[in-house]
Amino acid sequence: VSVDAADPGRGDVGGITAAASLRASRATTLRTAHDQVTAAIAEASPEVWTGQSREAFIVGATALAAELSTLAGQADAEASALSTYAQGVQSIKDEQARLELRRADATADLALYKRQKRTADIEATTDMAIGASTDAQERSATYADWIAQSEADLAAVDAAWQDLVSDRE
């Protein structure tokens, strides 16, 4: 199954959870049937029922009880696997939402710092031409640092996003 790199959290957690619940319910039903068959075996005492038909019933019912127990175990295992998978998908969805917010914040910060740096660069050029203070140059250098930090934040978000994609694969 390929993972959509643009949406690593894609999946219906509710649907997966519902499928897990259905299998857990099926396991309960199978265990109830197992208990009923086991009770029927116990009730088929030699005092009540004798002969070959009783023996055939005991053999068949015992085999049925074993099969019901096996099927209940399989349904429980499927329910557990689906529940674990649903939790994993939800965890990825939650992390994806956090990363999307971090990306949006870093992108907005980057755009703001670039605009502010351009303004500071223009002011610094003017200030240098007239021999004024170096405040604008210092602001430009500060914005350059903030731009680098925002770009590093975006790179970290991209790396974490790729980790999500890998986790889902």
Language-model segments: residues:
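N-terminal secretion-targeting helices of virulence/extracellular proteins
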Residues: 1-167
